[in-house]
Amino acid sequence: MSKITSSTLLKFKQEGKKFTALTAYDASFAGAFDSEGIDVLLVGDSLGMVLQGHDDTLPVTVEDIVYHTRCVRRGIKRSLLIADMPFMSYATPEQAMTNATALMQAGANMVKLEGGHWLLETVTKLTERGIPVCAHLGLTPQSVHVFGGFKVQGRDADNAQRIIDEAKAIEAAGAQLLVLECIPAALAKSITEALTIPVIGIGAGADTDGQILVMHDVLGISSGYIPRFSKNYLAQTGEIRSAIRAYIEEVDTGVFPAAEHTFS
């Protein structure tokens, strides 16, 4: 199978073909996900919670992401690999350039940053210098204390319009991909239709171009709180590779996410 690139994802969007993404943190799981056909793998700062046992993603360092990006890169042949830029690793464009360079040198194809209008200069500078950017709007976990917890965003008219405006501005600044997390399905649909770049949803309804989940949720091995938008595919298949194939098939056919996985 041909390698997935940002151009591949753009073609998928233009053709109306849904694509799938998962988090991955090591070579073995990444290799399995890659060989079964997952299009995008994310070395997420979610590792702070699912691997390191923290209550949020804030303690994760650039060095943590670099280490796990190298691990995942060794295990894959086809998937597009995105690396999260952790909390306060891109507070200025200069800091972002230094840290994004380290992640690209570790094997990432793209870096992901959380935030809206304040990120525009950073997004432009990174893309102008050859570092592709995936933006992240809606519930941005690095801002959990600003939000007062992990809460659905964009439910009122003002916040919904802000997210729409930020999505358009980030695309104009040069971002090649956008993640929308925990926003009403109708809002995510509007943004997806308004943008040229592909949009990946997590808790954002079925009308985004792609879907992403945390691998621990897909395999039913998360401890503590289980997000409403997640689905345990291992429980219905009994085998890891079968679970991944079921996830891909349900996204492709529109079965997932269903109404119970979305917000209004």
UniProtKB/Swiss-Prot annotation:
- Which Gene Ontology molecular function entries are recorded, alphabetically? 3-methyl-2-oxobutanoate hydroxymethyltransferase activity; magnesium ion binding
Q: Which domain of life is it from?
A: Bacteria
Alphabetical list of CDD domains matching this protein: KPHMT-like (cd06557)
Principal EC category: transferase
GO biological process: one example: pantothenate biosynthetic process
> Could you name the Gene Ontology cellular component terms for this entry?
cytoplasm
Cross-referenced Pfam families, in alphabetical order? Pantoate_transf
Q: What does the UniProt function comment say about this protein?
A: Catalyzes the reversible reaction in which hydroxymethyl group from 5,10-methylenetetrahydrofolate is transferred onto alpha-ketoisovalerate to form ketopantoate.
Oligomeric state and partners?
Homodecamer; pentamer of dimers.
Q: What is this protein called?
A: 3-methyl-2-oxobutanoate hydroxymethyltransferase
Give the species: Shewanella loihica (strain ATCC BAA-1088 / PV-4)
